[in-house]
Amino acid sequence: RIRGQAVRCDYTVSMQYGKTGCFQFPGSSLSGKIFIPDISIPFHADCLKNPDHENHLGTWLSTPEFIKKLLPRRPLESHKGDFGHLFTVCGSSGMAGAAMLASMGALKNGTGLVTSCVPSKLRDAIPGQVPEIMTLSPPECLEMFEEKDSDFVIDRSHKGSATVLGCGLGIHSRTTEFVRTLCREITSPLL
């Protein structure tokens, strides 16, 4: 919470280290572009390296550059199949975006292969937007998943390293039974 008054900035300069309030809402909405100049405080200063020090910062800013250093580089000879295969069971009539966003998020986060199991009315919408996503549909599943689709989905889920279930499925009672069955029967890690 911002106490008192605050100025909406185009630029903020935060000496040596970013201040938490500049990166979290609501302060982030007022900070503008943030610059953090080095003013020669050594990183090994006691207040930084010792969590028991009374002035220890206790927080770290995760920037894309910081995260990139933590992630292993993929070998040049690797194949997309080396990085997992996610099976998503998502979507219903009017909810193609939920299935697409779940699958796109998996690809963006490094999953090698993604297969999206959706009702047949949604099946052509996804590859048209994101050709990397493979799609399939249970026979006779037009607009929403039902209990009769569970065997088809369970059989195909075993091809994936993990399964995502739920994005945009809706709340129809027939879909609820389908979800209960999948939660009991799918043996791969289920999200």
Feature-to-residue mapping (PLM):
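Rossmann-fold NAD(P)-binding glycine/threonine-rich loop
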Residues: 1-10
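Small-residue (G/A/S/T)-rich helix-start motifs and N-terminal tracts that mark the onset
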Residues: 9-11, 17, 22-191
